Amino acid sequence: MKEFIISEAKVETAVLVGLITQMQDERKTNEYLDELAFLAETAGAEVVKRFTQKLPTANSVTYVGKGKLEEIRQYIRTEEEEEREVGMVIFDDELSAKQIRNIEAELKVKILDRTSLILDIFAMRAQTANAKTQVELAQYKYMLPRLQRLWTHLERQGGSGSGSGKGGSVGLRGPGETQLEMDRRIILNRMSLLKERLAEIDKQKATQRKNRGRMIRVALVGYTNVGKSTIMNLLSKSEVFAENKLFATLDTTVRKVIIDNLPFLLSDTVGFIRKLPTDLVDSFKSTLDEVREADLLVHVVDISHPGFEEQIEVVNKTLADIGGGGKPMILIFNKIDAYTYVEKAPDDLTPRTKENLTLEELMKTWMAKMEDNCLFISARERINIDELKDVVYQRVKELHVQKYPYNDFLYQTYEEEE
């Protein structure tokens, strides 16, 4: 099996499909599809159409009902007649091997689900050997129960011509591109090798963490694309890659930061996202160890996002799942410069909702109860950054006195790094 060769994605057109269910209303489904569209664009695809259907639960055979599947098929056929080829259909939930096989048989195009799309972006973003190894293992975990479908799919894609070089397309990056006769034993052997490699990396990183000295560890956590890397750059005065795309950060970056006379370690971690299976998150153990071993979590939230409260829940649940819950935390509401609200007309007598609240009114809701553990900033416009430094400094100092009460360097003179 060859190592990853990260490929440049050609522009492919994509159709999105989501469900409106008892547990997921239309507003939430549209919000999820907005995120799925952003994921598709990050992977290099152009979204041209969306389909939704109301069902109690997903159809176990074809995800959507037969009538909706036929509607999607007719749309693809019409586009082909107009010489506008649809490259793929992306579903907003993880599909079973049976569902993928049945849907492909009907639509005759590439079928992706949310998980495979996210893994494809991981493959694009991975830069270090550690990240590439983690991504490869995660992709094999996803691939293993879908092997039979993968063979058929890759043969349709053109087998020998779809190698892992420059021609890789959305959903086909990483392993599985060149060996169509891959079987379960080969994959399991490869996974064992990758796990051994990651175990060795874990040991190396654990040793590195032990050698960092007696300093408080602070980890930036949050949903993907909320501005963690920009905040990292402001606090550490270093250049960590920051981009307005999902999963711009995949490798954990650790920097020594000094505020006033107090040095501490600050790490920027991979962003979390909804509907990502825990067993795939587990592939990123060495990366997430920075979160597990942190003394303080700085939870960054994009307050301009309409679903920011649900994103907070996703992050908190993921933290609990990986063993990072229950730690001291500061909640940072970023992007206040981008916050918008819907102003009601004077004669509108309907009850006000969250969408009608100004930022000042929103700040007086449940967030007000958090007092010093909550801060509102704009990292891009550098609004309230001094206040952010003050809050982080106070919390780090409190933790340092508790953890290292006899550490002399608290009384030494340090200067903030230029």
Positions of predicted regions on the chain:
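Conserved catalytic network of the ASCE P-loop NTPase/AAA+ motor domain
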Residues: 8-9, 77-84, 256-260, 265, ...
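Switch II of P-loop NTPase G domains
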Residues: 2-5, 31-34, 57-74, 251, ...
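Conserved Switch II/interswitch segment of TRAFAC-class P-loop GTPases
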Residues: 22-23, 59, 94-97, 292-313, ...
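N-terminal accessory targeting/assembly segments
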Residues: 1-119
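Short alpha-helix plus adjacent loop in nuclease-associated cores
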Residues: 117-138
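Switch I (effector-binding) loop of TRAFAC-class P-loop GTPase G-domains
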Residues: 2, 210-213, 234-264, 273-283, ...
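Switch/connector loops and helix/strand junctions flanking conserved nucleotide-binding motifs
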Residues: 24-27, 58-62, 97-102, 119-122, ...
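C-terminal-of-GTPase-core extension/linker across diverse P-loop GTPases
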Residues: 1-16, 37, 148-226, 232, ...
